[in-house]
Amino acid sequence: MNAAELRKLSAEQLKDKLAESRKELFDMRFRHATAQLEKTSNLPATKRDIARILTILKEKG
């Protein structure tokens, strides 16, 4: 999801999306540690998504 799409969401929706992304990152890290993660490039992408969401939440105040 890009920044323009995220900016259209409300603060509550962003918080839900943030929780979902953090859970996804946790699961990916676990699968990576047990050598079950196929696309390791998704790890940094998810981190960037979390950073984007946090930035937009700060902008909204």
UniProtKB/Swiss-Prot annotation:
GO terms for molecular function: structural constituent of ribosome. GO terms for cellular component: cytosolic large ribosomal subunit. Keywords: Ribonucleoprotein, Ribosomal protein. Pfam families: Ribosomal_L29. The keyword Transferase does not apply. It comes from the Bacteria. CDD domains: Ribosomal_L29_HIP. GO terms for biological process: translation. NCBIfam families: L29 (TIGR00012). Belongs to the universal ribosomal protein uL29 family. PANTHER family: 60S RIBOSOMAL PROTEIN L35/50S RIBOSOMAL PROTEIN L29, LARGE RIBOSOMAL SUBUNIT PROTEIN UL29C. This is Large ribosomal subunit protein uL29. The gene is rpmC.
